[in-house]
């Protein structure tokens, strides 16, 4: 009986540890990178439900914040502080578009796809509200979203 309980507890804790922990990813906030000026790297990140993303303030003057209307319904919004790392756990499947608030007009935006891009069409339609504010890199968000088709 003792042997059975020991094995049962071992299996329970093994199963619990697998379910509890998702992968961790890092996105850097940069003045200049592979995608040009004022970018997040990687610009488009695909993760699984339950994964965590650390938005790293690699260079000063940036933040990471979700954009209302450009994330799955019922998903938790986030607002990182200026010059601060912020860590976000993604529990809802779909496409999330986020910004660097002070550099939105420069199209400093990024995309996280959690699982399947179930809300892609809605994001494309709603993205017009944000792309009209860009003064440079006007096609950046459209090009990011085009990679998800």
Predicted regions and their residues:
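Extracytoplasmic copper-binding redox domains, predominantly the cupredoxin/blue-copper superfamily
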Residues: 20-149
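Bacterial N-terminal signal peptides that target proteins for export
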Residues: 1-9
């Amino acid at each position: 009986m003792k042997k059975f309980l020991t094995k049962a507890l071992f299996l329970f804790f093994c199963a619990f540890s697998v379910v509890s922990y998702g992968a961790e990813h890092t996105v850097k906030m940069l003045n200049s990178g592979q995608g040009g000026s004022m970018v997040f790297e990687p610009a488009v990140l695909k993760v699984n439900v339950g994964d965590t993303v650390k938005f790293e303030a690699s260079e000063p003057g940036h933040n990471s914040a979700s954009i209302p209307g450009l994330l799955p319904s019922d998903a938790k919004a986030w607002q990182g502080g200026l010059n601060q790392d912020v860590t976000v756990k993604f529990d809802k499947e779909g496409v999330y578009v986020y910004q660097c608030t002070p550099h939105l007009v420069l199209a400093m935006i990024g995309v996280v796809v959690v699982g399947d891009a179930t809300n892609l069409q809605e994001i494309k339609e709603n993205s017009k509200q944000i792309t009209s504010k860009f003064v440079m890199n006007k096609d950046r968000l459209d090009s990011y979203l085009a990679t998800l088709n």
